[in-house]
From Swiss-Prot:
Belongs to the NrdI family. This is Protein NrdI. HAMAP family: NrdI. InterPro entries: Flavoprotein-like_sf, RNR_Ib_NrdI_bac, RNR_NrdI. The gene is nrdI. Probably involved in ribonucleotide reductase function. GO terms for molecular function: FMN binding.
Amino acid sequence: MKVVYFSFSGNVRRFIKKAEITNTMEITQNNCTEKIEEPFILVTGTIGFGEVPQPVQSFLDINHDLLRGVAASGNRNWGQNFAKAGRSISEKYQVPLLMKFEVQGTQNDISEFKDKVGQFNEDYGREEIQSY
């Protein structure tokens, strides 16, 4: 499954790179209004007091129908606003919040994320096979 991500400060980009996931797309100001054609998992940071970054919201306005899950990065110093963008997206679009991780994640976070993406790939494959 495609992993679409937004990295304001480079932390999420480093997380994705360490996870060695190849089917990815980085949301930027230049492509945030681009329509994609396949289901995806979103990974995003949180800005301000728990807000969804504007490029992510613009992307979701167009592509939310293909969103299957979300993971969020944040800083625990923000307390209850830690990775709040993930919770907001999960609630708004009724998709699972797969995980929250701090800054660029630990090795355990990366392993957990890879496992969850792998499970989505297996489940999505089964759905495709069963739909025949």
